[in-house]
Swiss-Prot record:
PROSITE patterns named among the record's database cross-references: FBOX
Record's protein name: F-box protein At4g35930
A Gene Ontology term for the protein's cellular component: nucleus
Biased composition annotated in UniProt, kind: Basic and acidic residues: 1-13
Domain F-box: 159-207
Region feature Disordered, mapped onto this chain: 1-23, 228-258
Amino acid sequence: MGKVSPKDLDSKTSVRKKKLKSSSNKYLKPGALVQLCYSKASAAKSCNELGKKRVPVFDTKSCNDLGKKRVPVFDIKHARNNKMAVEQLNSPKSPLMLSPVNVVKRSTLVRPMKFDDLQVESNNTCKKSPLMLSPMGIVMQNTLLRTPKTPQADPCVSESQLESLPMDLLVKIVCHLHHDQLKAVFHVSQRIRMATILARQYHFNYTTPDRSRQEMLRVMTPVPINRWPFRRGDGNPTMVSSPHTPKAPKHAPRPPSRTKLAEMKQITAVLFQDQTPFPSRCIVPSVLQRPTLFKPMAPKHPRVLFYEDELCQAVAQNNLT
């Protein structure tokens, strides 16, 4: 194998680099097309050099001040290119937005919009139908489809006449309410809620719930026009009696026993002739005598409790059975 000269190595590496450059030049980097168009447009606007065919930027005031007649030299092809570049930069429906970098940039620039802004922008975007075809249009559609935030109302500072009362009076008023009324009052306002908490902690006497009222509430749901005690519109109080629990069904009568006691005695007498029908140990007296710990005391000692020495003396004399 022959040795390779360093010149050949340099030539090979240069050829590889050229190939890589040529292959990489086939595809534009993200945002490169935008930079090219922007540089062309800025060069067309800022170029005032003589001897070059450019589209001039007309300024009527400066022309009138100088009093000179300027005849622009138009290059049709160059003017077309510049016009297209400017339109692509200014219009939101340009194909430049197909670059993923620009889509990300535009999507990050989209701010959270209010409901009024959404209405205005939806009207504007409806006029420009091609906007919906671009990625920017997709981002705008996503923002338009979001549910707008509910406008938060400012906290009401004004208080009613009941809430303006001192806290001790509010607590006394709350103490006269029933348990089922406290559930609704607790959510009226923050001040009444504090009064309810104080009433529960310190001043509530736990006389509620009224049992009769609770039973009546179970039976009848009051109409909003009704007040306690439940009255009709004509003013006649009608106390609704709670329904009685239905009686439980009676059991069916027991069938008569098939064996009779007289027949059982005759059978046992024949079977157990040598033995008594029931042994003495099985006989249980009809009336059991309750054992008495103490003998009946004389009427002069009506006491039930005794001292320790008295009990010891009674045990020594065998007075306890």
